[in-house]
Every structure is written in structure tokens, then in C-alpha cells.
Amino acid sequence: MLSRSHSNATMSTTRHRLLATASRFVETLESLDMDAMLAVRSSTCLHHMCCPSFRNYSITNDQTREALPQWKATIKKYKFGVLDDSQTLVDEQARKVMIRAETAAETTVGDYNNEYVFILRMTEDCNAVDEIWEFYDTIRLRDLRHRLEAGHVPIGVDAPAPFTTTASPAAL
């Protein structure tokens, strides 16, 4: 959960709304509730995976909805949250929040832990996420990908977003 240590009296309304939306984004990722995850996003939200070793690509809300069930099927236990509140950055003018996050999951092929940096651009009213840039440790993901392959769990275009290695035709 993002720290709310700043006094509401001293925090600008824009900053408060940006942080509140970022906090909702984190909470919905932890919940893995698809409807909640999409509710915090604008209808035109694009999610950019920014890791060249897995090929950069972007996915829409519809593609996220298609991919999540397969990802959830590999998870037994899951935890996601902000790694370090002190590294959260807010750019009010650009309506962006950067967070450093971590995940710990028990999957069908063993433990998976990773760190992420998310840059979230919010809508004009700051109440929804309009664009997401996600950066993650590709070595850790590559290890999980190899374990999934060895376990004959689908990867590639039809795999959940974190394991997709090429853009789907709709994303091109």
C-alpha cells in the first residue's frame, strides 16, 4: 500500500488523487480480480511491457482480460505490493506516478519472486490509469518461463501477459 504519511492539508489535491489511484492500481494487482483491475483503468488504457529481452509490446484491456485466467491458473499463492514507498515519485503536471513493486508467488512450477517499476499515467481527472509502463527483472522471469516450458505450460502469444514473448496480432 502506498504510504499516506503526507498530511492531506499539505498535499495538493492532484497529488492526493494520483497517489490514491496508484494505490488502487496496486491493490487490484494483488487481488487478481479482473473486474477490479480493469475498473481502475480507463477504457483505452494501454499496458506497455518494456523489457527488450522479451520484446517490447503493448496490450489493451481486452487482451489483459484474455490473458489473466491462464496466468491465474499457474498461481497457488500470490502477493504483490509496493517495495519501497520512499521511491514512489509523483509528477503532478504529467499526471504520472512511478512505483517500485515486488511480487512473491507460489506457482505450479515453484516459487516466483520479482521486482518491478511501474510508471502510471492517469486520466485528466486523475481517477483512472490511462497508460502503464512496466519494467521487470527479465532474468527472474526467464527462469520462470523455462520452468513453465519444462512443465508444458503454454507460453508465447497465447500465454499470460508476463510470459508473452511476441506481440499478438491485435497488438501490432
From Swiss-Prot:
Protein task: Part of the gene cluster B that mediates the biosynthesis of the fungal meroterpenoid acetoxydehydroaustin. The first step of the pathway is the synthesis of 3,5-dimethylorsellinic acid by the polyketide synthase ausA. 3,5-dimethylorsellinic acid is then prenylated by the polyprenyl transferase ausN. Further epoxidation by the FAD-dependent monooxygenase ausM and cyclization by the probable terpene cyclase ausL lead to the formation of protoaustinoid A.
Superkingdom: Eukaryota
Subunit structure, as described in the record: Homodimer.
Homology family: Belongs to the trt14 isomerase family.
Cited InterPro entries: Fungal_Meroterpenoid_Isomerase
Note from the entry: In A.calidoustus, the austinoid gene cluster lies on a contiguous DNA region, while clusters from E.nidulans and P.brasilianum are split in their respective genomes. Genetic rearrangements provoked variability among the clusters and E.nidulans produces the least number of austionoid derivatives with the end products austinol and dehydroaustinol, while P.brasilianum can produce until acetoxydehydroaustin, and A.calidoustus produces the highest number of identified derivatives.
Cystine pairs: none
Source species: Penicillium brasilianum
Listed name of the protein: Austinoid biosynthesis clusters protein J
GO biological process, any: terpenoid biosynthetic process
Pathway as given in its UniProt record: Secondary metabolite biosynthesis; terpenoid biosynthesis
